[in-house]
Design a protein with these regions (language model features):
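Ser/Thr/Asn(+Pro)-rich, low-complexity disordered segments
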Residues: 1-73, 77-96, 108, 132, ...
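Extracellular polysaccharide-recognition and catalytic grooves
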Residues: 60, 65-66, 80-299
Length: 622
């Protein structure tokens, strides 16, 4: 509550009577109801009485949480006022449906319909919310094609938005009077806790990837809405650094704690055991299904005066949806996760995420490291305010907009990562690069480039660069794929940027140029990342093996990319069409790998208490 209240004190604007937006203002108001002085509590009640509801999802669900969880903090007139605001939101909430994309807003709408309908006697809303909860469960758990069955929801493993999913499901599970709605919400909440627990890497106290949507604190690690929700629900100690939200100008991530703190959660014992006691190595693959994407926003972004306002949009492009799969591999020392193909437009997705523990206990940011990627146009810089080139929209410091399209083949601790620029950025290009981003609150124990220890930075390197690092008990090797086109003879660059270390693979860096969408879609870049532990070999042996690795890339008909990587007697081969965004083949030692539903392996076992057989399927409902 203190985190939320202090953030609200900083953000509150007396001229608008708001903290950012109405939802966040109500989160601030909740925190004031628990403050130490009557003046603060009175101010909280005033905010509830005077701020209007601007949406039909998060905000009315928040008001319902207040009415259901802390009714004694309100007087009769204020409770009646909030009941009326929720009732007025029901009509618009009825228009919100799940379409294989965003999950948190539909779940908030369904909570509003069920609970708001029950409280106001509007049975149509209860029936509709229950029916949509049922359809949501059926879609994410039972959706099938000829070769695949869906295992994971579309907006998966987001350290911000998965937390919201848990809140709204927990609220319905605890308070719905309608038996089917309560049963569905409880099932979904508890299975989502199992999902969260599978991704939790207890040695680093971070969540393994991939992540459908991430803000900087989510990607960097050390604080997130999901960390805070897990802390509230599990009551096990976790390292948190809320200062990251101030560094990256993301106060909502602090304000929301007031809502997370007042809810009742229903964590199954299975999830607690998997989270904290899973054996290593722990590996899982799961299918998911996402909507196709087309830019359709008509909202405007304010720049100070109406004449300077600009449309708020995302990518002016169409991206195919459909099936893809997610791979996660955890050892005692590190966790590596990847998405074979992006989540929708991948505005701020982590298609690849590595978490490395750097100490026996996690007490500060330098005790772990995160590694992830972004493709960026025109000099966009991590941790700073930018103009997204593909969206033509200002982006604040809370996230770095993803301006590339990715495809990843991961097997165990090794990943082949292919990137191409987003077609929407084809005009007015002054630069495009792929950044492999390292959190850098502490140096590597060893960092070696082309067999030489790294001294002063920055470095400009050739495409055939070999990079090895030692981080506590984890060893890593990176081989860039030669960028095509390449920005000069030394298109690989290593440099510091604030609290980050960036390994950049640069396709273009020069005067403004316009390209056709087809031409820029043919640009290519990427890298191979291989991780290992000190339990597998010595640092010297790892470097020797890294020098003997080999990577090649062949492009057929100017379209299909095939990357072949050999290491220590094993071979990975990855074929991908970046124009259609279709993976054609993934072979490990010549054997095709194509996940069709859900598979878990815990220390070599595929059955047992740490190996759920599915997440949301109908078979588990009984």
């Amino acid at each position: 509550m203190d985190l939320a209240r202090k953030a609200g004190d900083r953000c509150y604007d007396p001229s608008t009577n708001r903290c950012l937006i109405s939802r966040d203002t109500f989160w601030y108001a909740i925190s004031l109801l628990f403050a130490g002085t009557e003046e603060q509590r009175r101010r909280g009640r005033e905010l509830f009485a005077t701020v209007t509801v601007d949406d039909c999802t998060h905000t009315p669900a928040t008001l319902l949480a207040v009415l259901l969880r802390i009714p004694d903090a309100l007087d009769d007139s204020l409770r009646t006022h909030l009941e009326g605001a929720v009732s007025q939101a029901l009509g618009d909430a009825a228009l919100v449906e799940f379409h294989d994309g965003n999950v948190n807003h539909p779940l908030a709408a369904y909570a509003t319909l069920v609970l708001g309908g029950e409280r106001s006697g509007q049975e149509w809303a209860v029936r509709l919310g229950t029916r949509r909860l049922r359809a949501f469960r059926e879609r994410i758990g039972d959706h099938r094609s000829r070769y695949r069955r869906q295992a994971e929801m579309s907006e998966y493993n987001s350290l911000t938005y998965t937390a919201l999913d848990l809140w709204f499901l927990a609220l319905v599970a605890e308070h719905a009077r309608t038996e089917e709605a309560r049963r569905l919400a409880l099932f979904l909440e508890q299975r989502l806790w199992v999902d969260v627990a599978m991704h939790f890497h207890a040695p680093s106290q971070q969540f393994a990837g991939p992540h459908s949507r991430s803000y900087h604190e989510d990607s960097l690690g050390g604080y997130s809405g999901l960390h805070c929700t897990m802390l509230a629900a599990f009551d096990d100690p976790l390292f948190l650094d809320p200062g990251l939200c101030e560094r990256f100008d993301h106060p909502s991530a602090l304000l929301q704690n007031s809502l997370a703190a007042i809810l009742a959660y229903h964590v199954p014992d299975e999830a607690r055991d998997i989270a904290w006691r899973k054996p290593f190595p722990y590996a899982f693959r799961m299918t998911t299904y996402g909507e196709s994407y087309h830019e359709n926003s008509r909202r405007e972004t304010s720049h100070g005066s109406p004449s300077e306002n600009s449309p708020f949009a995302f990518d002016d492009e169409i991206y195919p949806g459909g099936w893809t799969d997610l791979t996660t591999y955890l050892t005692e020392e590190y966790a590596l996760g990847s998405a074979a193909l992006p989540y929708v437009n991948a505005g701020h997705s982590d298609c690849l995420m590595a978490r490395i523990r750097r100490g026996q206990k996690i007490k500060k940011l330098s005790d772990f490291r995160s590694i992830y990627t972004r493709g960026v146009f025109n000099g966009a810089e991590i941790g700073e305010k930018n103009i997204s080139h593909v969206a033509h929209t200002p982006v604040d410091r809370s996230y770095l907009y993803e301006e590339g399209r990715s495809a990843v083949y991961q097997h165990g601790g090794t990943a082949i990562v292919c990137y191409t620029p987003k077609r929407a950025g084809h005009a007015g290009v002054t630069g495009f690069r792929l950044d492999l981003i390292f959190g850098f609150h502490g140096p590597f124990d060893d960092l070696v480039v082309n067999e030489q220890p790294v001294g002063a930075l920055p470095l400009s390197l050739g495409s055939d660069t070999l990079i090895c690092f030692r981080d506590y008990q984890t060893f890593g090797m990176i081989r860039p794929l030669p960028p095509s086109p390449a920005a000069g003879q030394h298109p690989v660059r290593l440099r510091h940027s604030g609290e980050f270390l960036l390994l950049s693979m640069v396709n273009y860096d020069g005067p403004p140029r316009d390209f056709s969408r087809h031409e820029i879609n043919s640009w290519r870049t990427g890298f191979v990342l291989e991780l290992a532990t000190a339990q597998e070999s010595s640092w010297e042996e790892f470097q020797t093996r890294a020098r003997e690795t080999h990577v090649t890339e062949v492009v057929e008909h100017g379209i299909v990319r095939t990357v072949r990587y050999t290491s220590g007697g094993t071979t990975m081969e990855f074929s991908y069409d970046p124009f259609k965004e279709v993976i054609l083949s993934r072979r490990w030692n010549g054997v095709e790998e194509s996940p069709n539903h859900f598979e878990v392996e815990a220390a070599g076992n595929r059955k047992g208490p740490f190996c759920p057989q599915m997440l949301y399927g109908e078979e588990l409902m009984s």
